[in-house]
Amino acid sequence: MNSVEVAEPTEVPEPIPIIETSDDDNNTNTNTAPTPVLASNGFTNGHSHTNGHHAHGHATPSYIDSMAHLSVIRDDSDAASVRSNSSRASRRPQMQLSNYQDEFTTSVYGSRFAGMDLPRHHMPECEMPRDIAYRMIKDDLSLDNNPMLNLASFVTTYMEDEAEKLMAESFSKNFIDYEEYPQSADIQNRCVNMIGDLFHAPVGTAVGTSTVGSSEAIMLAVLAMKKRWKKRQAAAGKSTENPNIVMSSAVQVCWEKATRYFEIDEKLVYCTMDRYVIDPDEAVDLCDENTIGICTILGTTYTGEYEDVKAINDLLVERNIDVPIHVDAASGGFVAPFVVPDLEWDFRCEKVVSINVSGHKYGLVYPGVGWALWRDPEYLPQELVFNINYLGADQSSFTLNFSKGASQVIGQYYQLIRLGKHGYRAIMSNLTRTADYLTETLEKKGFVIMSERSGAGLPLVAFRFRTPQEGGDEDRHYDEFALAHHLRSRGWVVPAYTMAPNSNVKMLRVVVREDFTKTRCDSLISDVTLCLGLLDETDRESIKKREEYIKKHITTSGKGKHAHPSYANETHSLQGKTGKTHAIC
């Protein structure tokens, strides 16, 4: 049996000096700090005292020194007395140093900052403790909607912890600095190769680059098409004025930006009541010698339909028209190859010269990362590519920006090798099944389904109320926007849109993302049923008043007015001209 050794009482160590700052000057003096002492009973004592004397000079009772676990109770006047009796240093010029002292508190909400507004227009003069800054901003952001309940956006809202850790470790890396971060640059090249292979890009000739999203990728592709067209026209001695591009009126707003910024005329193929995508014959008929290209969409923003790239390609070949195709695969580029692999929309079509895809949508990476790929350097004019010697390394660059973080590219690489084709196929198959389940349920509730099913389009559900002509309720006194507002009160962000021009349709859209499980889908269905019941029980006048109130108090409705007043009522875009909603994607 082991014996227990009893520790001898620990001797009192030398007192620790404390430097105290006087309130009225910068002089310092030395006092002694009470030192913890381990008593023979194993407990730590209170404060020890020096020379057996009180700070006021009075004799300390002798039993105090002999009882190490007791302490004399003092007040602030004792310390003040010590300071007043200390010798003063000689007067000297004062340095202009900050007198600001940190404010310590036992709680963030007990600090003075909790009773102040967060700065909005001017940088504050003084610092704020980091824990308070974090909590104040976190509390402010808590008023945002829950991203997982935001069914308006295609943007990824879930990544694994390991992916997040890798990305966080790369926050400080400037991707453009190839010399210092060669592996990060090589990882981009690996991603370009893998995505190019997924899109059946010609081996050995295809080129590509990462971007901050599909908008930048589209801008680059449009620039390349315009420059190539301009060179061809100049070589033939023809005018290089008034270039145009053919596209559907359902395009995302970045296409309108590209045509406006780069001075290109739009030739629109308008949607109809029963067709929400481009018409191949009409698109090809609109082409002329000034057409720089045709935009086709692999998954439209509104209904998720895949436009018929193969049909347009075949018509161009059949009529011997030298017009290239760009495929906007922002949403569908990581879906179609796994759900409908036999669908020909990519570089298998000879007229397809460039493709963009968003890594931060169904590529399953947090925003923002996108990819732009070209069939051959022939379709990416050399005069658009800059060879830059930056920080010691020669590099070819074709981007609209320069510095950017490497973390999103690394996140994309993680997903590509972590999931592989099998993993992506499993995820996209689940999303397609969930979208079909939601489609069937909403259809049974009397909605008209506008989106495709069984993988023929993106995993989303676009739906609307039936009109009286379609057998809908003639007495229904609310629309899709009213239902969207009621769903928001339940936490769901289900957007209501005005469809593309000439279709004259209102609609709702649910984007089925990776984290939208069947259980969450059932919760949404229950809340749709609840909101429909509430709307049925609410009279027309009350609904109208509520809509007017929401419009008046737009900040609290989640639709704050962020447009600058000078630009609030623009009339140059499709939204300004026709009322089409520039939908979130």
Task: Give the residues covered by each predicted segment.
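A short glycine/serine-rich beta->alpha loop
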Residues: 152-155, 175-179, 204-212, 357-360, ...
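Hydrophobic alpha-helix feature that most strongly marks membrane-spanning transmembrane helices
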Residues: 291, 295-296, 317, 335, ...
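Glycine- and acidic
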Residues: 171-179, 203-209, 240-242, 266-271, ...
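Active-site C-terminal subdomain of aminotransferase-like
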Residues: 326, 338-459, 463-471, 476
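Secondary-structure capping and boundary motifs in well-ordered enzyme cores
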Residues: 183, 210-217, 247, 251, ...
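Structured alpha-helical segments in the cores of large, soluble enzyme domains
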Residues: 188-195, 251-255, 279-287, 401-408, ...
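Conserved PLP-enzyme active-site core in the AAT-like
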Residues: 91, 96, 100-105, 212-386, ...
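Non-catalytic terminal extensions of PLP-dependent enzymes
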Residues: 2-6, 16-23, 33-42, 52-185, ...
